[in-house]
Amino acid sequence: MITPNNHVAEMQGLYGPFTLAERVVQKIWLRGDFDRTRLALVDGRPLEIRHAGVWNLLGGPDFRGAQLVIGGERIIGDVEVHFHVTDWRAHRHEMDRAYDNVALHVVLFPPSLGERPARRGDDREIPTLVLLPLLHRDLEETASDDALETITARDEWEKFADLAAVPAAELAGLLRQKAAGRWRQKGCFAQLRIKRVGWGMAAHCTALEILGYRHNRAAMLAVAAKYPLEAWGVGCDVASIYAESGAIWQTQGVRPANHPQARLRQYQAWVVARPDWPDRLLQLVKTLPTGGLEATPTKLARQAFGLAKLRETFARDIAGDAVGGTRLDNLVCDGFLPLITAQTGEDAGMIWFHWFLGDVPEQVRTALPKLGVAGRGSGQALCHGWGQGMLAWILEQATRASRSTGENLPGA
């Protein structure tokens, strides 16, 4: 159940501890942000999810009325989500009649050897599904994205008050430092994905994920897993992929231009034009300027490195002119450059920092000029690095604020 005191775990990440709320695990289940093609329960029985259930914001199980097929048997029941199997007993759910219809216990971490599964009040054993080995993305990346989505949804200038108090001479250095950490993190996440699925599949998954925007990232990853790059050539039926992928699409609040079916058609046009685009991306690295985040003014860096022309090259030679504008900028900075760096070891951090801002929360776009960091009246151009530095700072503040409520758990 979701409560104001939502359970929070603290885990060890790439560069230190991070917090993960149980609510995030519930979102993973709701959005299907895991490999649904190889679902198996702890007892070995296969699982098929027909419907994840309705997210319950009141008392009782986390999801009501899920439609499942367990070992060939169709079941309609509730789903409860926890970090550990033992949380069921710790929360005394077996004593609560509201949980008598729970048909599946979804946990993040695998149970210890010999650990007993959860049981309902009628003493019936509840099947258990472990999510961790099935996740599309690293836990730290998922927690970070969720925190930023939640924080930046608040239209409050007050959250930047501490930054506004930093002397102007120090503020730029602080945000550069935060941006550098964010760049290293993105490179590590890209490296993990390449190690897990290989270069071509990693590039394919990353491209579709970014085209999904924040509403349909998980659904796009599910599509990428089911339909590899080779399936997107001439004759690919986008309508069938959209309907039959098994992905959980979110269309409420999505602009028509960003509708997932429109983005799938966009990716098809991309692959038809450049079926070998992951290989082209690796070849392009030979011509890229490399280096760290030296304090070069963005305007000069863009001129020296020819970033405007490089933007055209990415659009034409890699994406086949199928993607442009700010979404192309996010493809370059969230996808292409981290992947290139992870695969080749050539640091594209300088390009990444000075690249065009791309899609960022509107609060970040307006805060940078207000703080005198970049934009109108600051003498510095808005760029991706400043935006990422700001996002990293926001996330760090939120992590510090929530850590006091976290419980110490082993790293994932």
Kindly give the residue locations of the regions a language model identified.
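Compact, well-ordered interaction domains used in eukaryotic information-processing assemblies
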Residues: 74, 91-98, 104
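Hydrophobic, aromatic-lined core segments that form the binding pocket/scaffold
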Residues: 175-411
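Active-site ExK catalytic segment of metal-dependent nucleases
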Residues: 76-84, 105-107
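Intrinsically disordered, low-structural-confidence terminal and linker regions
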Residues: 1-9
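Internal, well-ordered alpha/beta segment that forms a basic, Gly-enriched binding/recognition surface
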Residues: 106-229
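Short Lys/Arg-enriched alpha/beta "domain-start" segment
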Residues: 8-48
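Active-site beta-strand-loop-beta-strand hairpin of nuclease catalytic cores
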Residues: 67-78
